[in-house]
Amino acid sequence: MTDKKKDVLQPVDDAARRQAKTLVRTARYASLATIDPADGSPSVSRVSLATAMDGSPVFLISRLSSHFANLEADPRCSLLVGEPGKGDPLAYPRMTLIGTAENLSLSPERAADRAHVKSRFLRRNPKAALYADFPDFAFWKFDTSRASLNGGFGRAYALAASDLAVPAGALQSLADFEEGAVEHMNAD
């Protein structure tokens, strides 16, 4: 008799990478798990979500929230993305991203990144324009270290950060395309 547990993870392939990237890019919200510095207990909240051009999740949160203080004390966190449909919610794809979050308002050298993130976030979440410039709100960028994708029953994958990354060479062409597409749509 063996004590070895059967590995239920599937090998990561292009279909899994595509599904993972799609889950992040199409998510309008996520569950954000942070660590309470007072006692180390987990705390979960919901945040509106968008992505930076490189595919990194970004969110806007208020300094008045407990998760803001938690992230300031310890940037380690996780995001759960995935939209359940009708029926059994466990039958739908979902993914937990594990990493750290960075407050973009703390660094003057991140001003260009902050402007880019704000623009993309507000295109995805236009109602946030009402409070995005309030002094107690800040944009945070999530840096993924690894992810756990559940693509549905029997389809589990352990992903590396590189599985979710947009290749550096593609970023500029994507940025150029996005700018032209937005200008074209605004002109129509």
Put a short name on every predicted segment:
Residues 40, 107, 148-150:
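Residue-level signal for secondary-structure boundary sites
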Residues 37, 64, 84, 147, ...:
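Residue-level signature for short turns and capping positions that connect secondary-structure elements
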Residues 6-7, 66-127, 134, 144:
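Short, structured beta-strand-loop surface elements
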Residues 2-72, 80:
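An N-terminal domain-cap segment
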Residues 44-48, 96-98, 139-141:
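Conserved hydrophobic/aromatic beta-strand scaffold that supports enzyme active sites
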Residues 23, 120-124, 180, 184-188:
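Residues that form generic nucleotide/phosphate-binding pockets
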Residues 2-9, 14, 129-188:
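C-terminal edge-of-domain segments
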